[in-house]
Amino acid sequence: FPDLILGWAQERDLNPLLVTALVRQESRFQPNIKSVVGAVGLMQVMPETGEWISTQLGQDSYSLTQPADNVKFGTWYLDFTHREYSNNSLFAVASYNAGPGAVSRWIEEKKFTNADEFVDKIPYPETKGYVESVFGGYWNYLRSYDPAVRARVDAL
């Protein structure tokens, strides 16, 4: 699904390697997977979230089991979470998993001063592991596919 991910990531001004890392964590690239809580497809979009996104996009007809719709909706939501948190990918990814209300509450209550502190103090174990996994995958993709990052790593 690289062309699909790249196309929607570029359309939404998201880093395609971050989106790829998120898809890997969410579904292991299995387009028909469904979670025990009901999330669907490559980007594990919840049906209720999909309904809300469809109204935001003005798209009445869609199927979250179809990779094209799922990635379109999932990247829209990831872009939404980025806009909610001033383009902070760490907060956006945590919000993608835990919901924007939870992340806003954590930020307000904890007054985080750096990214490591935020990750260490995420109160939901699932979300903490999710953020660590997505960003671990993202870092590996950056090292493998981003020439600037690869050059800096090789220079160490």
Residue ranges and their predicted role:
Residues F1-L156:
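Catalytic glycan-binding domains that act on GlcNAc-containing polysaccharides
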